[in-house]
Amino acid sequence: MKIPLAIRLPLRHGLVTALAMFALGNAPAHGAGVGAIEITHPFATPSLPGATTGAAYFATLANTGSQPDKLVRAATPVAASVELHTMSVDAQGVMRMREVDGIALAPKASIRMRPGMGFHLMLVGLKQPLKEGATFPMSLQFERAGQIEVKVVVQTSRAQDAMADMHAH
């Protein structure tokens, strides 16, 4: 009996998702927090050969407190500098990236960072390639919470999406 294509495609997608969730289900969730700031699953995308820039994200960056806070700086030994960036669509429908002076967090609010949209941390002047499976430290400076140290995991976008979905539920 032949299974119709309309049924086979969702089954195939569901199987891939289930396998990714199984593989990541045994991976320890990682994150950090100080005071009211909570960071879950810091990750970076693997860099292309010869690339001098990379990007890092958080599945969630949350402020559980009653006062606003702001991420104002970041640093890592794998890059000469880290810039805070945002991606947005301009009036002509063109995606634009720009550096920002900080990432504001309202009280009781959180943001989700993902490749291709919203905020990210641009790693400028990479000192080594970002290879899948590698980890590196990053120091984050907040106006109120102060300094938070995180361990960033280098992962492909499929693994990142699965982990972000796990943290979102």
Task: Please annotate each region the language model reported.
Residues 32-169:
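Compact, glycine-rich, soluble single-domain proteins
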Residues 13-25:
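Bacterial N-terminal signal peptides
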Residues 26-31:
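Sec/Tat signal peptide C-region and signal peptidase I cleavage site
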Residues 2-16:
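Bacterial N-terminal signal peptides that target proteins for export
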Residues 1-2, 23:
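Extended interaction regions within the primary functional domain
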